[in-house]
Amino acid sequence: MGFRKHVIEKSEARILAYLHVSFAGIYAFSKTVMVGESEEMRLMAPADAVKVADANRDVIVGIKVRVGKHSSGTSGTQPLDIALQVADETGMPLMCHIDHPPPTYEEVVDRLRPGDILTHCFRPFPNAPCTGQGTVKPAVQRARERGVIFDVGHGGGSFSFKTARTMMANGFYPDTISSDIHTVCIDGPAFDQVTTLSKFLCLGMDLKDVIAATTVNCGSALQRPEFGSLRVGALGDATILSVKKGSFDYIDVTGEHLIGDRKIVSEGVVLKGAMWHPRDNKFAKLA
């Protein structure tokens, strides 16, 4: 597995992966070219995915699939159904991306099992988790009740303040807060993980809950409870954060701006109990 050999094993920071059920994975993904890998059903490789997952259980934490108008096109939920078979065969959780319909939000979450993860959970209309009347869709509530994990995955088209406000007003908070940084959104609106955390802080989520959603809750979702913990005997990995006060302009994928009074800032990283910086490692000369 090239990614393991050339990236994971050479990285000082720990990297875990979800294995895409498409043989090609995500490809042709840029601001000018976008091809949905899940639309081409000939690329679905369930038998190969099971073999690779079984051979790399130390670094592969689950199975991944993307469905929606932009990622699966006319294939609809078929890639999701195949990915669920792989997840069942390997005993691993599934992470499912959702974008524009079809399929609908309801069709996707109705298929997910306890411990499976829906990412881009607070996406805007169309295919938002809430109704136009400001309520949580019944299928979404049922999914949470049976143990489906709702992950933010803030990228270029997958998070809106309106959806977040509506869901949180109904007491429906994300289980995990993550970014989805790629070529389309690294220059905005997502920018980075701490900006995503800051948005939830300024939307009214308690700081302790924001931090839990990016640490201990993530360890639980990964089924790796040793992650996201500072207890005695834990791995000794941590990010040092501070909260700055001021006036900060945040933007979502719809173009809505939120002026917040706080900003979470990364002050440093600790790996295995020691301070770490990417420019101090063996790849510094390439930076």
PLM region spans:
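Residue-level recognition of short, solvent-exposed, well-ordered loop/turn junctions
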Residues: R113, R231-L235, L271
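Active-site core of metal-dependent hydrolases
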Residues: V65-T166, N170-D187
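His/Asp/Glu-enriched, well-ordered alpha-helical/loop segment
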Residues: K162-V243
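Divalent metal-coordination and catalytic microenvironments
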Residues: F3, V21, I63, L118, ...
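C-terminal cap of metal-dependent C-N hydrolases
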Residues: G236-L286
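Solvent-exposed alpha-helices and their adjacent loops that cap or buttress functional pockets
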Residues: I8-K10, A53-R57, A87, V109-L112, ...
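Divalent-metal coordination cores built from histidine and acidic residues
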Residues: M1-R66
